[in-house]
Protein backbone atom coordinates (compact mmCIF):
# COMPACT_ATOMS: atom_id res chain seq x y z
CA UNK A 1 0.00 0.00 0.00
CA UNK A 2 1.31 3.46 -0.94
CA UNK A 3 2.58 5.75 1.77
CA UNK A 4 -0.12 8.37 2.53
CA UNK A 5 0.33 12.03 1.61
CA UNK A 6 1.23 13.99 4.73
CA UNK A 7 2.34 17.47 5.74
CA UNK A 8 3.99 18.39 9.00
CA UNK A 9 5.01 21.82 10.28
CA UNK A 10 8.44 21.41 11.89
CA UNK A 11 9.14 24.99 12.97
CA UNK A 12 7.58 28.44 12.87
CA UNK A 13 8.92 31.97 13.12
CA UNK A 14 6.06 34.43 13.23
CA UNK A 15 3.73 33.25 10.47
CA UNK A 16 6.59 31.71 8.47
CA UNK A 17 6.53 27.90 8.49
CA UNK A 18 9.21 25.28 7.94
CA UNK A 19 7.69 21.93 7.12
CA UNK A 20 7.86 18.74 5.13
CA UNK A 21 5.48 17.10 2.69
CA UNK A 22 5.92 13.34 2.58
CA UNK A 23 4.79 11.35 -0.46
CA UNK A 24 5.62 7.93 -1.94
CA UNK A 25 8.02 9.49 -4.47
CA UNK A 26 9.88 11.55 -1.89
CA UNK A 27 9.88 14.38 0.60
CA UNK A 28 9.36 18.05 -0.22
CA UNK A 29 11.08 20.47 2.12
CA UNK A 30 9.03 23.62 2.63
CA UNK A 31 9.07 26.48 1.93
CA UNK A 32 9.73 25.02 -1.52
CA UNK A 33 10.30 26.51 -4.96
CA UNK A 34 9.17 24.30 -7.84
CA UNK A 35 11.01 24.75 -11.15
CA UNK A 36 8.53 24.91 -14.01
CA UNK A 37 8.76 21.99 -16.43
CA UNK A 38 5.96 23.11 -18.72
CA UNK A 39 6.11 20.46 -21.43
CA UNK A 40 7.94 17.79 -19.45
CA UNK A 41 11.21 19.72 -19.44
CA UNK A 42 12.73 22.47 -17.32
CA UNK A 43 13.95 24.50 -20.28
CA UNK A 44 17.71 24.20 -21.04
CA UNK A 45 18.27 21.88 -18.03
CA UNK A 46 18.55 18.12 -17.76
CA UNK A 47 16.78 16.53 -14.82
CA UNK A 48 19.90 15.49 -12.89
CA UNK A 49 20.91 19.17 -12.89
CA UNK A 50 17.49 20.21 -11.59
CA UNK A 51 17.80 17.71 -8.77
CA UNK A 52 21.40 18.76 -8.20
CA UNK A 53 20.52 22.38 -7.47
CA UNK A 54 18.22 21.19 -4.68
CA UNK A 55 14.74 20.88 -6.20
CA UNK A 56 12.50 18.29 -4.51
CA UNK A 57 9.56 18.74 -6.89
CA UNK A 58 8.89 20.17 -10.35
CA UNK A 59 5.75 21.46 -12.02
CA UNK A 60 4.22 20.14 -15.23
CA UNK A 61 1.56 21.89 -17.26
CA UNK A 62 -1.63 20.01 -18.09
CA UNK A 63 -2.59 22.24 -21.02
CA UNK A 64 0.72 21.94 -22.85
CA UNK A 65 1.15 18.21 -22.17
CA UNK A 66 -2.43 17.54 -23.24
CA UNK A 67 -1.75 19.19 -26.61
CA UNK A 68 1.72 17.77 -27.09
CA UNK A 69 2.61 14.90 -26.82
CA UNK A 70 -0.82 14.02 -25.36
CA UNK A 71 -1.75 12.65 -21.94
CA UNK A 72 -2.77 9.23 -23.25
CA UNK A 73 0.60 8.85 -24.99
CA UNK A 74 2.49 9.83 -21.83
CA UNK A 75 0.43 7.26 -19.90
CA UNK A 76 1.28 4.53 -22.40
CA UNK A 77 4.95 5.40 -21.99
CA UNK A 78 4.85 4.95 -18.23
CA UNK A 79 3.68 8.35 -16.96
CA UNK A 80 5.40 11.71 -16.75
CA UNK A 81 8.03 10.60 -14.22
CA UNK A 82 9.28 7.83 -16.49
CA UNK A 83 8.83 9.91 -19.65
CA UNK A 84 10.91 12.83 -18.33
CA UNK A 85 13.28 10.73 -16.18
CA UNK A 86 12.29 12.56 -12.99
CA UNK A 87 11.49 9.99 -10.26
CA UNK A 88 10.63 12.59 -7.63
CA UNK A 89 7.30 14.38 -6.93
CA UNK A 90 5.56 16.32 -9.70
CA UNK A 91 2.75 18.85 -9.33
CA UNK A 92 0.57 19.49 -12.36
CA UNK A 93 -1.55 22.59 -12.75
CA UNK A 94 -5.07 22.18 -14.10
CA UNK A 95 -4.51 23.84 -17.47
CA UNK A 96 -7.12 26.49 -16.76
CA UNK A 97 -4.79 29.48 -16.73
CA UNK A 98 -3.30 28.60 -20.12
CA UNK A 99 -6.74 27.94 -21.61
CA UNK A 100 -7.78 31.43 -20.55
CA UNK A 101 -4.57 33.17 -21.60
CA UNK A 102 -3.34 31.31 -24.70
CA UNK A 103 -6.30 29.75 -26.44
CA UNK A 104 -8.36 31.40 -29.14
CA UNK A 105 -12.13 31.24 -29.47
CA UNK A 106 -12.63 29.82 -25.98
CA UNK A 107 -16.13 29.45 -24.59
CA UNK A 108 -16.76 29.09 -20.87
CA UNK A 109 -19.85 27.33 -19.47
CA UNK A 110 -20.84 25.60 -16.25
CA UNK A 111 -19.73 22.33 -17.83
CA UNK A 112 -16.20 23.56 -18.56
CA UNK A 113 -14.40 25.36 -21.35
CA UNK A 114 -14.14 24.66 -25.06
CA UNK A 115 -11.19 26.14 -26.90
CA UNK A 116 -8.88 25.85 -29.85
CA UNK A 117 -5.23 24.91 -29.53
CA UNK A 118 -2.77 27.79 -29.82
CA UNK A 119 -0.57 25.38 -31.83
CA UNK A 120 -2.79 24.21 -34.69
CA UNK A 121 -6.29 25.48 -33.96
CA UNK A 122 -7.68 22.02 -33.17
CA UNK A 123 -10.80 22.04 -30.93
CA UNK A 124 -10.67 20.73 -27.36
CA UNK A 125 -12.90 20.53 -24.31
CA UNK A 126 -11.68 20.88 -20.74
CA UNK A 127 -14.05 20.10 -17.88
CA UNK A 128 -13.13 19.63 -14.22
CA UNK A 129 -13.43 15.88 -14.76
CA UNK A 130 -11.27 15.92 -17.90
CA UNK A 131 -8.61 18.04 -16.17
CA UNK A 132 -8.31 15.50 -13.36
CA UNK A 133 -8.37 12.63 -15.88
CA UNK A 134 -5.44 14.18 -17.78
CA UNK A 135 -3.47 14.80 -14.59
CA UNK A 136 -4.10 11.20 -13.50
CA UNK A 137 -2.94 9.91 -16.89
CA UNK A 138 0.23 11.94 -16.42
CA UNK A 139 0.46 10.26 -12.98
CA UNK A 140 1.30 13.50 -11.17
CA UNK A 141 1.58 13.44 -7.38
CA UNK A 142 -0.19 16.72 -6.64
CA UNK A 143 -3.09 17.67 -8.91
CA UNK A 144 -4.77 21.05 -9.08
CA UNK A 145 -8.47 21.73 -9.48
CA UNK A 146 -9.69 23.40 -12.67
CA UNK A 147 -10.49 27.03 -11.92
CA UNK A 148 -11.18 30.30 -13.67
CA UNK A 149 -8.55 32.96 -13.09
CA UNK A 150 -9.56 36.55 -13.83
CA UNK A 151 -6.93 39.10 -14.78
CA UNK A 152 -6.79 42.22 -12.63
CA UNK A 153 -8.21 44.79 -12.62
CA UNK A 154 -11.69 43.35 -13.17
CA UNK A 155 -15.28 44.20 -12.29
CA UNK A 156 -16.43 42.90 -8.90
CA UNK A 157 -19.35 40.97 -10.41
CA UNK A 158 -16.97 39.21 -12.82
CA UNK A 159 -14.55 38.31 -10.01
CA UNK A 160 -17.41 36.93 -7.90
CA UNK A 161 -18.85 34.90 -10.79
CA UNK A 162 -15.45 33.32 -11.51
CA UNK A 163 -14.85 32.60 -7.83
CA UNK A 164 -18.22 30.88 -7.40
CA UNK A 165 -17.71 28.85 -10.57
CA UNK A 166 -14.28 27.78 -9.34
CA UNK A 167 -15.81 26.55 -6.07
CA UNK A 168 -18.35 24.42 -7.92
CA UNK A 169 -15.58 23.07 -10.13
CA UNK A 170 -13.52 22.27 -7.01
CA UNK A 171 -16.31 19.98 -5.77
CA UNK A 172 -16.43 18.23 -9.13
CA UNK A 173 -12.64 17.86 -9.20
CA UNK A 174 -12.69 16.38 -5.69
CA UNK A 175 -15.27 13.80 -6.79
CA UNK A 176 -13.33 13.00 -9.97
CA UNK A 177 -10.05 12.67 -8.07
CA UNK A 178 -11.55 10.22 -5.60
CA UNK A 179 -9.11 8.43 -3.33
CA UNK A 180 -5.71 8.11 -4.98
CA UNK A 181 -3.34 6.64 -2.36
CA UNK A 182 -0.26 8.76 -1.73
CA UNK A 183 -1.46 11.60 -3.93
CA UNK A 184 -3.22 14.91 -3.31
CA UNK A 185 -5.61 17.32 -4.97
CA UNK A 186 -5.37 20.99 -4.03
CA UNK A 187 -8.17 23.53 -4.23
CA UNK A 188 -7.48 27.06 -5.46
CA UNK A 189 -8.62 30.18 -3.61
CA UNK A 190 -9.90 32.86 -5.98
CA UNK A 191 -11.53 36.23 -5.38
CA UNK A 192 -9.29 38.70 -7.17
CA UNK A 193 -8.40 41.74 -5.10
CA UNK A 194 -11.58 41.63 -2.99
CA UNK A 195 -11.07 40.68 0.65
CA UNK A 196 -14.59 39.42 1.27
CA UNK A 197 -14.53 37.14 -1.78
CA UNK A 198 -11.12 35.76 -0.81
CA UNK A 199 -12.42 34.89 2.66
CA UNK A 200 -15.54 33.23 1.23
CA UNK A 201 -13.47 31.20 -1.20
CA UNK A 202 -10.94 30.11 1.42
CA UNK A 203 -13.62 29.11 3.91
CA UNK A 204 -15.64 27.16 1.34
CA UNK A 205 -12.57 25.27 0.13
CA UNK A 206 -11.43 24.57 3.69
CA UNK A 207 -14.81 22.97 4.38
CA UNK A 208 -14.16 20.50 1.54
CA UNK A 209 -11.37 18.85 3.53
CA UNK A 210 -8.78 18.83 0.75
CA UNK A 211 -5.15 17.81 1.26
CA UNK A 212 -3.73 21.22 0.33
CA UNK A 213 -4.72 24.68 -0.80
CA UNK A 214 -3.39 27.09 -3.39
CA UNK A 215 -3.87 30.83 -3.66
CA UNK A 216 -4.50 31.69 -7.30
CA UNK A 217 -5.31 34.77 -9.29
CA UNK A 218 -2.49 36.88 -7.88
CA UNK A 219 0.60 38.29 -9.61
CA UNK A 220 -1.67 38.85 -12.62
CA UNK A 221 -1.20 42.59 -12.96
CA UNK A 222 -1.91 43.93 -9.48
CA UNK A 223 0.73 45.77 -7.37
CA UNK A 224 2.74 43.68 -4.92
CA UNK A 225 1.06 45.46 -2.01
CA UNK A 226 -2.34 44.16 -3.16
CA UNK A 227 -1.00 40.62 -3.46
CA UNK A 228 0.42 40.76 0.05
CA UNK A 229 -2.82 42.20 1.42
CA UNK A 230 -4.74 39.28 -0.09
CA UNK A 231 -2.29 36.83 1.50
CA UNK A 232 -2.71 38.54 4.88
CA UNK A 233 -6.45 37.98 4.53
CA UNK A 234 -6.42 34.52 2.98
CA UNK A 235 -3.78 32.49 4.83
CA UNK A 236 -5.43 32.70 8.28
CA UNK A 237 -8.61 31.25 6.74
CA UNK A 238 -6.81 28.11 5.50
CA UNK A 239 -6.15 25.05 7.68
CA UNK A 240 -2.86 25.36 9.57
CA UNK A 241 -2.09 21.67 9.07
CA UNK A 242 -2.29 21.75 5.26
CA UNK A 243 0.28 23.10 2.76
CA UNK A 244 -0.35 26.47 1.12
CA UNK A 245 0.80 27.11 -2.43
CA UNK A 246 1.04 30.57 -4.04
CA UNK A 247 0.70 29.97 -7.76
CA UNK A 248 2.94 31.65 -10.31
CA UNK A 249 5.00 33.64 -7.80
CA UNK A 250 7.53 34.96 -8.21
CA UNK A 251 10.46 37.27 -7.66
CA UNK A 252 12.85 36.55 -4.77
CA UNK A 253 11.32 39.52 -2.94
CA UNK A 254 7.80 38.16 -3.51
CA UNK A 255 8.90 34.83 -2.07
CA UNK A 256 10.45 36.33 1.08
CA UNK A 257 7.38 38.44 1.80
CA UNK A 258 4.96 35.60 1.06
CA UNK A 259 6.79 33.13 3.30
CA UNK A 260 6.45 35.73 6.05
CA UNK A 261 2.68 35.45 5.56
CA UNK A 262 2.52 31.67 5.80
CA UNK A 263 3.03 30.39 2.23
CA UNK A 264 4.79 27.02 1.82
CA UNK A 265 5.12 26.43 -1.94
CA UNK A 266 5.95 28.53 -5.00
CA UNK A 267 6.43 28.14 -8.73
CA UNK A 268 7.41 30.63 -11.39
CA UNK A 269 8.92 30.66 -14.88
CA UNK A 270 11.00 33.71 -13.93
CA UNK A 271 14.39 32.08 -13.20
CA UNK A 272 14.31 29.91 -16.33
CA UNK A 273 12.87 32.58 -18.63
CA UNK A 274 15.32 35.19 -17.36
CA UNK A 275 18.20 32.79 -17.97
CA UNK A 276 17.18 32.43 -21.61
CA UNK A 277 17.23 36.21 -21.98
CA UNK A 278 20.62 37.00 -20.48
CA UNK A 279 19.52 37.86 -16.95
CA UNK A 280 21.17 36.33 -13.89
CA UNK A 281 19.89 36.28 -10.31
CA UNK A 282 22.59 36.68 -7.67
CA UNK A 283 22.90 37.60 -4.00
CA UNK A 284 23.69 41.12 -5.26
CA UNK A 285 20.47 41.34 -7.25
CA UNK A 286 19.87 40.92 -10.97
CA UNK A 287 22.75 41.11 -13.44
CA UNK A 288 22.07 41.75 -17.14
CA UNK A 289 24.79 39.91 -19.06
CA UNK A 290 23.80 41.64 -22.29
CA UNK A 291 25.30 44.88 -21.00
CA UNK A 292 28.63 45.92 -22.56
CA UNK A 293 30.12 46.53 -19.10
CA UNK A 294 30.75 42.78 -18.85
CA UNK A 295 32.57 42.39 -22.19
CA UNK A 296 36.11 42.54 -20.70
CA UNK A 297 35.33 41.41 -17.14
CA UNK A 298 37.26 38.26 -16.13
CA UNK A 299 35.44 37.96 -12.80
CA UNK A 300 32.72 35.35 -12.19
CA UNK A 301 29.09 36.17 -11.48
CA UNK A 302 29.57 35.23 -7.84
CA UNK A 303 32.80 33.73 -6.53
CA UNK A 304 31.01 32.51 -3.38
CA UNK A 305 28.33 30.53 -5.20
CA UNK A 306 28.25 26.73 -5.09
CA UNK A 307 27.01 26.68 -8.69
CA UNK A 308 29.76 26.19 -11.31
CA UNK A 309 27.89 28.47 -13.73
CA UNK A 310 28.22 31.38 -11.29
CA UNK A 311 31.65 30.51 -9.90
CA UNK A 312 33.72 29.13 -12.78
CA UNK A 313 32.85 31.17 -15.87
CA UNK A 314 33.86 34.78 -16.45
CA UNK A 315 31.33 37.52 -17.00
CA UNK A 316 33.09 38.23 -20.28
CA UNK A 317 32.45 34.69 -21.47
CA UNK A 318 28.83 34.72 -20.34
CA UNK A 319 28.37 38.10 -22.07
CA UNK A 320 29.85 36.66 -25.26
CA UNK A 321 27.52 33.64 -25.14
CA UNK A 322 24.45 35.79 -24.57
CA UNK A 323 25.28 38.34 -27.26
CA UNK A 324 26.13 35.55 -29.72
CA UNK A 325 22.88 33.76 -28.87
CA UNK A 326 24.76 30.58 -28.08
CA UNK A 327 22.63 27.88 -26.44
CA UNK A 328 25.25 27.45 -23.72
CA UNK A 329 24.55 30.98 -22.47
CA UNK A 330 20.93 30.13 -21.69
CA UNK A 331 21.98 26.83 -20.16
CA UNK A 332 24.54 28.37 -17.81
CA UNK A 333 22.37 31.30 -16.73
CA UNK A 334 19.36 29.05 -16.10
CA UNK A 335 21.59 26.76 -14.03
CA UNK A 336 22.76 29.79 -12.06
CA UNK A 337 19.24 31.12 -11.58
CA UNK A 338 17.70 27.87 -10.37
CA UNK A 339 20.70 27.39 -8.07
CA UNK A 340 20.12 30.86 -6.67
CA UNK A 341 16.41 30.23 -6.08
CA UNK A 342 17.05 26.91 -4.35
CA UNK A 343 19.78 28.45 -2.18
CA UNK A 344 17.31 31.19 -1.24
CA UNK A 345 14.78 28.55 -0.14
CA UNK A 346 17.50 26.70 1.79
CA UNK A 347 18.43 29.92 3.61
CA UNK A 348 14.76 30.63 4.37
CA UNK A 349 14.20 27.15 5.82
CA UNK A 350 17.33 27.37 7.97
CA UNK A 351 16.38 30.83 9.23
CA UNK A 352 12.89 29.69 10.25
CA UNK A 353 14.40 26.77 12.16
CA UNK A 354 16.73 29.10 14.08
CA UNK A 355 14.08 31.80 14.62
CA UNK A 356 16.12 34.30 12.58
CA UNK A 357 13.86 34.63 9.53
CA UNK A 358 13.25 38.37 9.83
CA UNK A 359 16.96 39.15 10.32
CA UNK A 360 18.04 36.84 7.50
CA UNK A 361 15.41 38.33 5.22
CA UNK A 362 16.75 41.80 5.96
CA UNK A 363 20.31 40.64 5.12
CA UNK A 364 19.17 39.16 1.82
CA UNK A 365 17.24 42.31 0.91
CA UNK A 366 20.22 44.48 1.84
CA UNK A 367 22.41 42.42 -0.48
CA UNK A 368 20.07 43.10 -3.40
CA UNK A 369 20.00 46.80 -2.54
CA UNK A 370 23.79 47.07 -2.61
CA UNK A 371 23.72 46.03 -6.23
CA UNK A 372 26.28 44.42 -8.47
CA UNK A 373 30.05 44.77 -8.10
CA UNK A 374 31.57 47.94 -9.62
CA UNK A 375 32.78 47.96 -13.20
CA UNK A 376 36.50 47.20 -13.57
UniProtKB/Swiss-Prot annotation:
HAMAP family membership: Q_tRNA_Tgt
Residues forming the catalytic site: 93 (proton acceptor), 267 (nucleophile)
Catalytic activity: 7-aminomethyl-7-carbaguanine + guanosine(34) in tRNA = 7-aminomethyl-7-carbaguanosine(34) in tRNA + guanine
Pathway: tRNA modification; tRNA-queuosine biosynthesis
One GO location term (cellular component): cytosol
Native species: Mesorhizobium japonicum (strain LMG 29417 / CECT 9101 / MAFF 303099)
Classification via InterPro entries: ArchSynthase1/Queuine_TRR (IPR050076), TGT (IPR004803), TGT-like_sf (IPR036511), tRNA_ribo_trans-like (IPR002616)
UniProt keyword terms in alphabetical order: Glycosyltransferase, Queuosine biosynthesis, Transferase, tRNA processing
Binding partners and assembly: Homodimer. Within each dimer, one monomer is responsible for RNA recognition and catalysis, while the other monomer binds to the replacement base PreQ1.
Cytoplasm keyword on record: no
Binding site for substrate: 93-97, 147, 190, 217
Lineage: Bacteria, Pseudomonadati, Pseudomonadota, Alphaproteobacteria, Hyphomicrobiales
The name this protein goes by in its record: Queuine tRNA-ribosyltransferase
GO terms under biological process: queuosine biosynthetic process; tRNA wobble guanine modification; tRNA-guanine transglycosylation
Protein family membership: Belongs to the queuine tRNA-ribosyltransferase family.
EC number: 2.4.2.29
Region entry RNA binding, spans: 248-254, 272-276
GO molecular function, one term: tRNA-guanosine(34) queuine transglycosylase activity
Function: Catalyzes the base-exchange of a guanine (G) residue with the queuine precursor 7-aminomethyl-7-deazaguanine (PreQ1) at position 34 (anticodon wobble position) in tRNAs with GU(N) anticodons (tRNA-Asp, -Asn, -His and -Tyr). Catalysis occurs through a double-displacement mechanism. The nucleophile active site attacks the C1' of nucleotide 34 to detach the guanine base from the RNA, forming a covalent enzyme-RNA intermediate. The proton acceptor active site deprotonates the incoming PreQ1, allowing a nucleophilic attack on the C1' of the ribose to form the product.
Tagged with keyword NADP: no
